[in-house]
Amino acid sequence: MAFNPIAPVHPLMLQQNLNPIQENNPVEGSGPQTPAGAAKVGADFGQFLQEALQKVDNLQKEADVASLGLATGQIQDLHTAVIAMEKAGLSLSLTVDVRNRALDAYHEIMRMQI
């Protein structure tokens, strides 16, 4: 078994094989370019949050009605009332967790040094 010697590496050969670094061009359409676009995205997010909180509020109201109906004897289905209360409890718990995560993220951003 014969071994071939390793050819020496010349710096000029390395430079010929390297491609020059190209300028980074921003990608067109990669995000809102104007304050109007940013305001629209903010409004959409605000609308989304408002709708989500409205759904949580509606579930809480349904649970209140179900528990009141169960207490007064108007609702005979125990499982319907329990399901409504569990939905309301879970949705409120999720809402509180999302709020806590958002506050943690805000505090983390505020701790960043510029």
Swiss-Prot record:
Annotated keywords: Bacterial flagellum
Subcellular locations according to the entry: Bacterial flagellum basal body
Gene Ontology MF annotations: cytoskeletal motor activity; structural molecule activity
Domain of life of the organism encoding this protein: Bacteria
Biological processes per GO annotation: bacterial-type flagellum-dependent cell motility
Keyword Cell wall biogenesis/degradation: no
One GO cellular component term noted in the UniProt record for this chain: bacterial-type flagellum basal body
HAMAP family: FliE
Database matches in NCBIfam families: fliE
Family label: Belongs to the FliE family.
Protein name: Flagellar hook-basal body complex protein FliE
Originating species: Desulfitobacterium hafniense (strain DSM 10664 / DCB-2)
